[in-house]
Every structure is written in structure tokens, then in C-alpha cells.
Amino acid sequence: MITTAEAQHKLTAPPSPAFDPIAHRYSHAGASLSSVSALIARHKRPFDERGNATRVAKREGRTVEDVLASWATKRDAAMDRGKQVHAEIERALEPHIGKRCAEINPRAAESPLAKHALAFLAEWSDAELVAQEARLMLPESRVAGTLDLLVRTPHGELVILDWKTNASLRLRAERTWADCKMLAPVAHLDDVAGSHYALQLSAYRLMLEARYD
């Protein structure tokens, strides 16, 4: 059974991918690596933004540009909220890395979403925080990613957590049509956020298994 200290050592031991936060790009040994999110995005069905905005504008008596602008505003606000919550959780957890979740104080955060996340972790009382914002990669597949948090249970199991701040999280498509599916080789999955996030966590799991093999 792996200990928290052993898990931390294996996780931080080289090699690890380099990351450029400005360009949001990973690299290793001079080679560019695709991010997990970019890899998954290539298997989503293209969204006809203008075509859909045209339909919404006609239905609601608005201009297409107004609809597009409102979508962009919502998208930017959602991204800002996600970054804020992630940063808040990270700051609150940093002093507790390597320690039991029971020591986490949900009141260390200000926003309701961050408080809920910390309260959720605190309920895992005997689990321990291994690491957060850990960079991983599969160099042979030219893909890399950063997991939000890794937790070790009292039984030695490693659990990956990834914080999401979506207004909603669809697990299934509302229709069964072919155009509601992702692209090959994952065309059996509904093209919804639930599938995208499941693929993301599965990729992190593969990277961890390679790291701990």
C-alpha cells in the first residue's frame, strides 16, 4: 500500500512536462505536447455558433450580433468564475498538503463554491492530500495535463479530483441522434460535458498509472 510520502515522491520525480501559462502549452524535451482538454476538443462535434445564434435571434426577436455578444459575455464570466474558485481552493489547501482532510477549514474560503468544495473534502476526514496542480504526461502519446487535486484514502487508493464550476452538467444527450455523439474513436459517447470530463479524468488516470508503474 502506497503512503502519501511515497505518492508525493513519485509524482514530483522527473520527468515532468514544462508548461507555458501564457500560451497554455505543454512541452517535453523540446517537443510540443497537446493538452488533455485540446485532445478532447478535437473529438467534439463542431458547434455552428453563427447558425445557432441566427436561430436564437429569430426566435427571440434579437440581432445575431447581440446573441453572439451575450454568449461571449457569459463565456468570459464563467471562465473568470472558474479561475477565481480554483485559485481560492488552491490557496486554502496549500498549507494542508500531506496532511489529513480533517484539518481543512471550509471557512478559509470566501465564495460559496469554494466553501462547498472544502467542506466536501473535510468530510473525507482520514484521507490525506497528496498534491494539487500536478503536471502529468504521456510523452509517447504527446499529451499532457494538470490535475487539480490528488487525494490518498486510508486504504492507499489514489483519488483524482477536478473542480468544475459549470452552471449545469449534462450527463446524457437529450436526443439519440448520431449528431449528438462525439467523433471517432469515441463516437459511442454523448457529446456532453459529462462525457468530456469523464475522458479528462480517464486521461489523468492513465498518466498516473504510468507514473506509479
Predicted features and spans:
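Secondary-structure junction/capping motif
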Residues: 32-36, 63, 101-102, 111-112, ...
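Charged, glycine-rich intrinsically disordered N-terminal tails and low-complexity linkers that flank
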Residues: 1-84
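A structural signal for alpha-helix termini and helix-coil/disorder junctions
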Residues: 42, 46-49, 91-95, 123, ...
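Metal-dependent nuclease catalytic cores in nucleic-acid-processing enzymes
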Residues: 189-213
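A generic alpha-helix structural signal
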Residues: 68, 117-118, 205
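Catalytic cores of nuclease domains that cleave nucleic-acid phosphodiester backbones
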Residues: 73-186
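DEDD superfamily 3′-5′ metal-dependent exonuclease/proofreading module
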Residues: 2-3, 9, 13, 17, ...
